[in-house]
Amino acid sequence: MDVNPTLLFLKVPAQNAISTTFPYTGDPPYSHGTGTGYTMDTVNRTHQYSEKGKWTTNTETGEPQLNPIDGPLPEDNEQSGYAQQDCVLEAMAFLEESHPGIFENSCLETMEVVQQTRVDRLTQGRQTYDWTLNRNQPAATALANTIEVFRSNGLTANESGRLIDFLKDVMESMDKEEMEITTHFQRKRRVRDNMTKKMVTQRTIGKKKQRVNKRSYLIRALTLNTMTKDAERGKLKRRAIATPGMQIRGFVYFVETLARSICEKLEQSGLPVGGNEKKAKLANVVRKMMTNSQDTELSFTITGDNTKWNENQNPRMFLAMMTYITKNQPEWFRNILSIAPIMFSNKMARLGKGYMFESKRMKLRTQIPAEMLASIDLKYFNESTRKKIEKIRPLLRDGTASLSPGMMMGMFNMLSTVLGVSILNLGQKKYTKTTYWWDGLQSSDDFALIVNAPNHEGIQAGVDRFYRTCKLVGINMSKKKSYINRTGTFEFTSFFYRYGFVANFSMELPSFGVSGINESADMSIGVTVIKNNMINNDLGPATAQMALQLFIKDYRYTYRCHRGHTQIQTRRSFELKKLWEQTRSKAGLFVSDGGPNLYNIRNLHIPEVCLKWELMDEDYQGRLCNPLNPFVSHKEIESVNNAVVMPAHGPAKSMEYDAVATTHSWIPKRNRSILNTSQRGILEDGQMYQKCCNLFEKFFPSSSYRRPVGISSMVEAMVSRARIDARIDFEAGRIKKEEFSEIMKICSTIEELRRQK
């Protein structure tokens, strides 16, 4: 069925149609090549915004650093990072005055979290800069490598698995005169193949020990690796994002925990909540301003945009905020929270892979690694690149650039929100002491400002005062990109408010369609997305029904599984026809086996296998759900799985869907080509870690435990658990005496092996 899209708009109010103007269909743009240029842009811009600050040299690393704090008062209309420390502290004090006890209580909550968090918190997250290998790794591997190096250097606090103990190790590691690390390298040699008698190149992976002096180690520990941010819509230029290493991550986590706890208590904060809860919070603030503006006052709203939020923030500012927020707390707690901002004010940015050069004439391609940029002759570069390199040279060392000011994307979202809210908080009449007043919403760098005043001059004065107050703490509201409207119509974090929030449906468009995991998961995710959008995004019944039909069409096209009696000829349709002819109850066939679609908008919550179970032929049931069927090679599947869906905007969201194991929930095999590269050793470490954890989960099926990290403790825990379980099973008569004694023997053998090792 082909659909005429204009039908969608017959009864749609104009403001709801805004979503169709968004650039959110089709594939988002991805970056190719290196991010070196983008990173240099970031470093140069950040220094430019703070250029009137003071230059100093870091005594430990010898790196040049720029400190703009308490620099010249900024001019109107120029973006700058010259935050005034006393202004920031005063904003914090007023925030505390308006919310008595807020910092105290948040500190207590955070202290509890600090005591309880295990080091495996750090295994969450994707790519992490691995300082031992000087490149990105999955978080779990990077953590395991760091702990392994710490242990071989005599640091053992982390055996117990508490994050705070791991952080003690990090602090101690920075005092060591040198660290010994293990790096992977590969050797190539030519050998004669016995079978073919040809010469072949054989690669072997070696591990070698390397000593790093204090200064080099500090530089590595303070390094953020950079990558290009992918899939950003609506932008012409790409930009760089940072991945910090394991030394920084734990400290950042605790700072953000404290800031999150504060944000939860602030009505103007758009973080950490999301979705419908966020909309309710925002609607409250708007309601408050509109009721108060009665008939005597005007109320206007600015849909705000800040210029280069991250590059004008300053870690030294965050240090001042932390010092104030934790002012009456125990010393150890204050120290732990001050380390992240201190590390950030001494950070180094890795420039990435470097530049690719091509000579069309000589058919040559060569890569200039970032390490060479400090010394290479600039005549090879075009003018814009030449300027970039000249500017960054004084800051370069071994392919990293010293970057003291600025925050890099996405590191302190919660804490910077607290700073933004503290300025919104100053808009109360008791602080403005005049006829205008303001309030608003802040979510990381995005804000909406609502100003009330008796007349237009008052509104203008209020906006000016807000603008200048922001300047004092290093927030630069962009006059070009912010616009003002009568209160009742504005946009905030891509929510459009028009006397209530309008569903911006186009944001969800990219998540409709076939995910490409496997036949079973794709069907389940597809219908769940439609169901969720009916609940949350005003997807009406008629449109949902149409979305469902389009999804089924897309699904059949993807898996080449048109109905069994179709005329479409593909390699697969031949088999599906045979299946169709020999099936008695054709309604019971999965859509992916050429069956009919039985979904409609009333039964989207039921997995397909349950929906059709009663209609299936018995032998079909047996094939689909028989654990002995060699094709059912799936993991033990819980009743709920998580899919990653990409909304058009913001981070990928995790969405739960029902997972029922059948022959169709296969797992594709991984590409094994990695085995011939130097990554092989790393991959094996990662798999070993995974295997240990899986084994451990078999022993402790309750969901209450947290993964331990010290391998020694894992083995001991499993052995003692095995002994207890065996005794209980033996006494209850579930296992025979021989089995019981065999288990005991195995346990003793394991312990014996550990002792010998």
Swiss-Prot record:
A motif (Nuclear localization signal) lies at residues 187-195, 203-216. This is RNA-directed RNA polymerase catalytic subunit. Influenza RNA polymerase is composed of three subunits: PB1, PB2 and PA. Interacts (via N-terminus) with PA (via C-terminus). Interacts (via C-terminus) with PB2 (via N-terminus); this interaction is essential for transcription initiation. It is found in: Host nucleus; Host cytoplasm. Its EC number is 2.7.7.48. Keywords: Eukaryotic host gene expression shutoff by virus, Eukaryotic host transcription shutoff by virus, Host cytoplasm, Host gene expression shutoff by virus, Host nucleus, Host-virus interaction, Inhibition of host RNA polymerase II by virus, Nucleotide-binding, Nucleotidyltransferase, Phosphoprotein, RNA-directed RNA polymerase, Transferase, Viral RNA replication, Viral transcription. One of its GO terms (molecular function) is nucleotide binding. Phosphorylated by host PRKCA. Residues 50-79 are annotated as: Disordered. Residues 249-256 are annotated as: Promoter-binding site. RNA-dependent RNA polymerase which is responsible for replication and transcription of virus RNA segments. The transcription of viral mRNAs occurs by a unique mechanism called cap-snatching. 5' methylated caps of cellular mRNAs are cleaved after 10-13 nucleotides by PA. In turn, these short capped RNAs are used as primers by PB1 for transcription of viral mRNAs. During virus replication, PB1 initiates RNA synthesis and copy vRNA into complementary RNA (cRNA) which in turn serves as a template for the production of more vRNAs. The keyword tRNA processing does not apply. HAMAP family: INFV_RDRP (MF_04065). Residues 55-64 have a biased composition (Polar residues). GO terms for biological process: DNA-templated transcription; symbiont-mediated suppression of host gene expression; symbiont-mediated suppression of host mRNA transcription via inhibition of RNA polymerase II activity; viral RNA genome replication; viral transcription. It comes from Influenza A virus (strain A/Dunedin/4/1973 H3N2). It comes from the Viruses. Residues 286-483 form the RdRp catalytic domain. The gene is PB1. It catalyses: RNA(n) + a ribonucleoside 5'-triphosphate = RNA(n+1) + diphosphate.
